[in-house]
Amino acid sequence: MALVRERRQLNLRLPLPPISDRRFSTSSSSATTTTVAGCNGISACDLEKLNVLGCGNGGIVYKVRHKTTSEIYALKTVNGDMDPIFTRQLMREMEILRRTDSPYVVKCHGIFEKPVVGEVSILMEYMDGGTLESLRGGVTEQKLAGFAKQILKGLSYLHALKIVHRDIKPANLLLNSKNEVKIADFGVSKILVRSLDSCNSYVGTCAYMSPERFDSESSGGSSDIYAGDIWSFGLMMLELLVGHFPLLPPGQRPDWATLMCAVCFGEPPRAPEGCSEEFRSFVECCLRKDSSKRWTAPQLLAHPFLREDL
């Protein structure tokens, strides 16, 4: 088994800290800021930092306000002295955000760079509801169907652009007060140049990796390149409903060996008996171990579980 023969370091993500009310003073910087990409004439000097929304992976996400329009945004700032891996992830995320324009993908309003200090900032729409991570166990099937439809439309859009997300999980799905859900965090995503490109590398969050991404040789290296996103999506849907990570008993903390065995050798998790037949079937279509039999995003959008939510 590929992953057993060559154990890779897991890409673990730290949870974002609680939203802070700490205010920032607005001081001018001696380093010149260059607008790499933007819209609506927004520049970095137009923005006032309000508080920290979160930090991790070498960067800080601020809640900011436009000084003239009072519009609220999220500003992700990364310093130039970060690890080269994070630098590549940032470049990849910037490239994908430049290419995408969908109501189901977080919108980029501008990219600013301070060449002298090597600082890069990405201005994105502000999602005031946080992430889906906070909703685990408190989501009804009806509400889950509404979320699923939006996420699948986002995945269908990305896959049509030959973009594989590779880290679909509750923490990377943003929510606003209108119950709109948008896909975010493209640091480990991949743009496929050729149809035969492989994307089964060990990146992202291992808990949500599909069987073929743990062991690419199990499918002879010919697995559906987009199917890993669907597996992650299916696990996430089940997790939001039952309130805990579905591959392990409630309260058990996952480790590499346990996860690998559960994903590669265990049976896929199923929805509880009390769930509707439509939802149970929906989850089963997402969590088929054979990636060639796993449903695609467009196919899942036509599933009876979502047709009930018109």
Swiss-Prot record:
Mutagenesis or variant effect for S195E: Constitutively active
Pfam families: Pkinase
Keyword list, A-Z: ATP-binding, Cytoplasm, Ethylene biosynthesis, Kinase, Nucleotide-binding, Nucleus, Phosphoprotein, Serine/threonine-protein kinase, Stress response, Transferase
Gene inactivation effect: Broad spectrum of moderate ethylene-insensitive phenotypes. Reduced salt sensitivity. Delayed senescence phenotype.
Database matches in InterPro entries: Kinase-like_dom_sf (IPR011009), Prot_kinase_dom (IPR000719), Protein_kinase_ATP_BS (IPR017441), Ser/Thr_kinase_AS (IPR008271)
Domain (Protein kinase): residue spans on this chain: 47-306
Protein name: Mitogen-activated protein kinase kinase 9
Gene source species: Arabidopsis thaliana (Mouse-ear cress)
Lineage: Eukaryota, Viridiplantae, Streptophyta, Embryophyta, Tracheophyta
Gene: MKK9
